[in-house]
Amino acid sequence: RGLGDVYKRQVLGLVKAQMVKNTVIVPTGAKGGFVPQHLPDPAVDRAAWLAEGIACYRIFVSSPVTLTDNIVGGEVVVPPNVVRYDDDDPYLVVAADKGTATFSDIANAISIERGHWLGDAFASGGSVGYDHKGMGITARGAWESVKRHFTELGRDCQSEDFTCVGIGDMAGDVFGNGMLLSRHTRLVAAFNHLHIFLDPFPDAASSFDERQRLFVLPRSSWADYDASLISEGGGVYPRSLKAIPLSPEVRGVLGIADTVTSLPPNELIHAILQAPVDLFWNGGIGTYVKALGETHAQVGDKANDALRVNGSQVRAKVVGEGGNLGWTQRGRVEYALTGGRLNTDFIDNSAGVDTSDHEVNIKILLD
């Protein structure tokens, strides 16, 4: 029950974002999720783990296809044994999301097997669709928001160096692409589920080139970052350490008291989220900022309870929300009331939705 409640809250939160995000296109937004109950241990048999996940995904996707109106010979056909209370509505498409990013071809195969009228236009992306990571479309859209925020502050992030902290790593779509959209990004700290990256005084040019190298390196992590390019006092540290040493340089850039010489990883991440930098770039998964009046239980992301901070504690001047649900809505309001500049996730990362809609429409036209 506990796990189910967590996923239920997460899906409902994503539904809210998706419905607003879909205002840029015609179809309304929806969201779904599934939790496999009998997954093998991936550390023991990764192939079996993936096969079970795909089998569950096939069940999950097949269900709405079976229940949705179809078009046959230009006429709407209602599925047998279905009692419906709405009008004809054969339009149903799916898009890759958390945990299913590489499953578009599987979904399209189901669509074709079931005779769904959209065929391989059913699931955007995949081998016959737009490659969102290759295009960098989600990050590019969010970066337009970032540029606007900087412009309102009288700065140009495309021609002037600026400091940044981030959530994610260079192997990721949104984080990786986002950290390559300006040659003037000085990434001073970042973290993912494995490592904490610290580079208190990075050279904008050489650090950009190194991030670009990691972006194209298969399955890269922060541990692959060339240590010789990290500025004095920085480094890459596993989150499994009991404590991480803090140099004077790191303390200075993150706004940590001089008396603090080391911190446990979770407390260091707290400091990164509150760093007095120009940009906070969220390209990760999870909810890291809430409002003072909200409890961690209300947020519904138990995995990050130990990391989460309040909106009023965030000292970055600008926030770019490449990832979904990185902040609660009340957390955004609290941050904005302190003078911070941000939009919302459904504004910043809506470009991917628009791209998928274009893809479906083009395929319908060609078919």
What are these regions (language model features)?
Residues 31:
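Duplex nucleic acid-engaging cores and interfaces of nucleic-acid transaction enzymes
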Residues 10-14, 20-22:
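N-terminal amphipathic, basic-rich helices that act as targeting or association modules
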Residues 90-91, 95:
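Conserved anion/nucleotide-ligand pocket segment
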Residues 36-41:
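Glycine-rich loop at the start of a catalytic domain that most often binds anionic cofactors/ligands
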Residues 2-7:
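Short, small-residue-biased leader/transition segments that mark boundaries at the very start
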Residues 42-43, 53-54, 58, 65-87, ...:
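Non-transmembrane, aqueous-exposed alpha-helical and coiled segments at domain scale
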